[in-house]
């Protein structure tokens, strides 16, 4: 192990000089022994000098401090010892429950599975949320993105999906909190304890491993914490297990890359993002895949800056996903939750050969009705409802009922709303929308369809109105 000295500190970026013959490799982990700080090599800039990112606060660093090259990348504990524990980017426990007794450690930088090793699946994952199961069904072993601006419900939807899938799913889950609120991470941990998914007394009985690099962490932590979580998920997958990987929020991973890129002296590209945006996203996303031994189904929240889906960060993420769930502020402003836009959300599973002809026809029928209503809104605003033809009046009436029927009470929102959460099986969802499109419920008031599960509840609700 060679030793070097710090020669420059600029925020989270540190330059270290080593003897010419022992310059560390890119992505090698270096340790500032006096401060017990880990750094990662990003560039070799000549003359034995390497430029590194600090994986922690660089406060108190000074020129001349000794730095040791470990000769290997950052390694983190993997395997069952990580279950039920909260770790940071380096795999160190931050839950005050003692050491992690892992026998194996993996480097966080690994190759994506080869084309021969990968395995595609067309099996559909039922999540019990009507709008998702109908319009943008998830695939087992697929990648799903939850897109939305600030405050439209990405984290609540993510938590409901964890509640509906992870709690009913017999496999293991990994949750990576990337640059999000510490309070949400804390709430998540205690909710998982209440649900029995995390067992503090017997961690080996837990079903989820948690890796946090939250908003207050330096950019180095936020840039690498997603890779730490992914490495743990890959280990479970390679054991032949079906793993769920939740990442909240993938945009903060991009943003950390932007912060680091500027400090490393790279020329910014569009909107100030790093020039390596597409490559950094690809390196992460290509590893999130299913192989012939096991599967990783990943659900990622994606913050959309200023509600602009054409922003380079969300636009780069789109290319990697199998299903996109787009949250719309205008739907949220009408008090309709989940605020998922059925016209913007897509899934490659919505194919008659995968979900069946009936499901496909119902989904397209719902979208067609909502699209026609969207087109008529301008006419209604100018001329009023009376100027519409009878057919168009019927379309408007059905579209409003469909919009209301797409709402649903969430288990995780029970504490705020007081309404008990509900899980709606796919067959009930299809039966309800089929009846609405066929006109079976044209005589019911549209308020009867708000926040109900199966369509029969609307009939009962209408009787009380």
Swiss-Prot record:
<comment type="similarity">
    <text>Belongs to the ATPase alpha/beta chains family.</text>
</comment>
<keyword id="KW-0406">Ion transport</keyword>
<dbReference type="InterPro" id="IPR024034">
    <property type="entry name" value="ATPase_F1/V1_b/a_C"/>
</dbReference>
<keyword id="KW-0375">Hydrogen ion transport</keyword>
<keyword id="KW-1003">Cell membrane</keyword>
<keyword id="KW-0547">Nucleotide-binding</keyword>
<dbReference type="GO" id="GO:0016887">
    <property type="term" value="F:ATP hydrolysis activity"/>
</dbReference>
<keyword id="KW-0997">Cell inner membrane</keyword>
<dbReference type="InterPro" id="IPR020003">
    <property type="entry name" value="ATPase_a/bsu_AS"/>
</dbReference>
<keyword id="KW-0813">Transport</keyword>
<comment type="subunit">
    <text>F-type ATPases have 2 components, CF(1) - the catalytic core - and CF(0) - the membrane proton channel. CF(1) has five subunits: alpha(3), beta(3), gamma(1), delta(1), epsilon(1). CF(0) has three main subunits: a(1), b(2) and c(9-12). The alpha and beta chains form an alternating ring which encloses part of the gamma chain. CF(1) is attached to CF(0) by a central stalk formed by the gamma and epsilon chains, while a peripheral stalk is formed by the delta and b chains.</text>
</comment>
<dbReference type="GO" id="GO:0046933">
    <property type="term" value="F:proton-transporting ATP synthase activity, rotational mechanism"/>
</dbReference>
<feature type="binding site">
    <location>
        <begin position="148"/>
        <end position="155"/>
    </location>
    <ligand>
        <name>ATP</name>
    </ligand>
</feature>
<dbReference type="GO" id="GO:0045259">
    <property type="term" value="C:proton-transporting ATP synthase complex"/>
</dbReference>
<keyword id="KW-0066">ATP synthesis</keyword>
<dbReference type="InterPro" id="IPR027417">
    <property type="entry name" value="P-loop_NTPase"/>
</dbReference>
<dbReference type="InterPro" id="IPR055190">
    <property type="entry name" value="ATP-synt_VA_C"/>
</dbReference>
<dbReference type="InterPro" id="IPR036121">
    <property type="entry name" value="ATPase_F1/V1/A1_a/bsu_N_sf"/>
</dbReference>
<dbReference type="GO" id="GO:0005886">
    <property type="term" value="C:plasma membrane"/>
</dbReference>
<dbReference type="Pfam" id="PF00006">
    <property type="entry name" value="ATP-synt_ab"/>
</dbReference>
<keyword id="KW-0139">CF(1)</keyword>
<dbReference type="InterPro" id="IPR003593">
    <property type="entry name" value="AAA+_ATPase"/>
</dbReference>
<comment type="function">
    <text>Produces ATP from ADP in the presence of a proton gradient across the membrane. The catalytic sites are hosted primarily by the beta subunits.</text>
</comment>
<dbReference type="Pfam" id="PF22919">
    <property type="entry name" value="ATP-synt_VA_C"/>
</dbReference>
<keyword id="KW-0067">ATP-binding</keyword>
<dbReference type="InterPro" id="IPR005722">
    <property type="entry name" value="ATP_synth_F1_bsu"/>
</dbReference>
<dbReference type="InterPro" id="IPR004100">
    <property type="entry name" value="ATPase_F1/V1/A1_a/bsu_N"/>
</dbReference>
<protein>
    <recommendedName>
        <fullName>ATP synthase subunit beta 2</fullName>
        <ecNumber>7.1.2.2</ecNumber>
    </recommendedName>
</protein>
<dbReference type="InterPro" id="IPR000194">
    <property type="entry name" value="ATPase_F1/V1/A1_a/bsu_nucl-bd"/>
</dbReference>
<dbReference type="GO" id="GO:0005524">
    <property type="term" value="F:ATP binding"/>
</dbReference>
<dbReference type="Pfam" id="PF02874">
    <property type="entry name" value="ATP-synt_ab_N"/>
</dbReference>
<dbReference type="InterPro" id="IPR050053">
    <property type="entry name" value="ATPase_alpha/beta_chains"/>
</dbReference>
<keyword id="KW-0472">Membrane</keyword>
<keyword id="KW-1278">Translocase</keyword>
């Amino acid at each position: 192990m060679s030793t070097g000295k710090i020669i420059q500190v600029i925020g989270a970026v540190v330059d270290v000089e080593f003897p010419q013959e022992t310059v560390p490799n890119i992505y090698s982990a270096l340790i500032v022994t006096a401060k017990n700080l880990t750094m990662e090599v990003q560039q070799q800039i000549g003359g034995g000098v390497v430029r590194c990112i600090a994986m922690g606060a660089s406060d108190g660093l000074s020129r001349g401090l000794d730095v040791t090259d470990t000769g290997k990348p950052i390694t983190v504990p993997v395997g069952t010892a990580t279950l039920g524990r909260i770790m940071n980017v380096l795999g160190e426990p931050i839950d005050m429950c003692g050491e992690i007794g892992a026998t194996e450690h993996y480097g966080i930088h690994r190759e994506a599975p080869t084309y021969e090793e990968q395995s595609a699946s067309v099996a559909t994952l039922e999540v019990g949320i009507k709008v998702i199961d109908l319009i943008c069904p998830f695939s087992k072993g697929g990648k799903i993105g939850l897109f939305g601006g600030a405050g439209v419900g990405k984290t609540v939807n993510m938590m409901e999906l964890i509640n509906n899938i992870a709690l009913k799913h017999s496999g293991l889950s990994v949750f990576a909190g990337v640059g999000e609120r510490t309070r949400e991470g804390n709430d998540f941990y205690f909710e998982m304890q209440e649900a029995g998914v995390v067992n503090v007394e017997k961690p080996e009985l837990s079903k989820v491993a948690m890796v946090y690099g939250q908003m207050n962490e330096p950019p180095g932590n936020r840039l690498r914490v997603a890779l730490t979580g992914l490495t743990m998920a890959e280990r479970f997958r390679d054991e032949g297990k079906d793993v769920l990987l939740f990442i909240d929020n993938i945009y903060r991973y991009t943003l950390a890359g932007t912060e680091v890129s500027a400090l490393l002296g790279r020329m910014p590209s569009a909107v100030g993002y790093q020039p390596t945006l597409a490559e950094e996203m690809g390196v992460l996303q290509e590893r999130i895949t299913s192989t012939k031994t096991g599967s990783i189904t990943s659900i990622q929240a994606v913050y959309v800056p200023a509600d602009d889906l054409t922003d380079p960060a969300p636009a780069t993420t789109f290319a990697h996903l199998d299903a996109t769930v787009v949250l719309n502020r205008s739907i949220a402003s009408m008090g309709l939750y989940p605020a998922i836009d059925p016209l913007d959300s897509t899934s490659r599973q919505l194919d008659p050969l995968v979900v069946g002809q009936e499901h496909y026809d119902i989904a397209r029928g719902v979208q067609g009705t909502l699209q026609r209503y969207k087109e008529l809104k301008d006419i209604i605003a100018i001329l009023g409802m009376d100027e519409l033809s009878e057919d168009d009046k019927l379309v408007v009436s059905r579209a409003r009922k469909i919009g209301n029927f797409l709402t649903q009470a969430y288990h995780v929102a029970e504490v705020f709303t007081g309404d008990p959460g509900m899980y709606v099986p796919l067959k009930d969802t299809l039966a309800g929308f089929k009846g609405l499109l066929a006109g079976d419920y044209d005589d019911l008031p549209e308020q009867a369809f708000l926040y109900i599960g199966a369509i029969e509840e609307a009939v009962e609700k209408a009787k009380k109105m």
